[in-house]
Amino acid sequence: MNQDPTQQLEPFLKRFLASLDLLYTQPTSQPFPNVESYATQLGSNLKRSSAIIVNGQPIIPSPQEDCKLQFQKKWLQTPLSSHQLTSYDGHLIPGTGTFVVHFSAKVRFDQSGRNRLGESADLFQENNSIVSKTNQRPIWGSWFGVDVNLVVDENVMQDGEIINSMDYRFTYVPNDSIIKV
């Protein structure tokens, strides 16, 4: 009996979204040795030569930095996020070894005023506060709607750089959010 080749897409998509939501300081696991090693894990499935579009704006590679690195740098500056996959559709393109995947998700952002590294724009940082930076909880805002189109290599069960193209687009922005996209 033939198995549906798209069956392996859902676990892959969940792993990819989890890579976009990584915490710099994980309370349950070994912390990252430095910011660079953390940043390289954000969207780690993207190929260095990936075509990346965010909200209709393409990320243009420079001679010094590829699209993946530029995306990771921009994503590092955003607040902490939490993605939730809502639906997906994928089609294997015969003879090419690639899937075309379209999925919808919800994402919410931390509205506490800190970026992914816990940095804020406060002029005076309280060094000896009762609550340390690692124990500060995110203040989640309302859910945004996201629509993503991917072109991925057929071997989606292997971790590695397998995303050839990504179009990440916000389809719903809540009125009560302080985050502007």
UniProtKB/Swiss-Prot annotation:
Quaternary context: Interacts with MEX67.
Short name of any one Pfam family annotated for the protein: Mtr2
Main location: nucleus
Protein location: Nucleus
InterPro entries on file: NTF2-like_dom_sf, Nucl_pore_RNA_shuttling_Mtr2
The keyword Secreted appears for this protein: no
Protein name: mRNA transport regulator MTR2
Keyword Nucleus: yes
Keywords: Nucleus, Transport
Species whose genome carries this gene: Candida albicans
Domain of life: Eukaryota
Entry function: Affects mRNA transport from the nucleus to the cytoplasm.
GO cellular component: nucleus
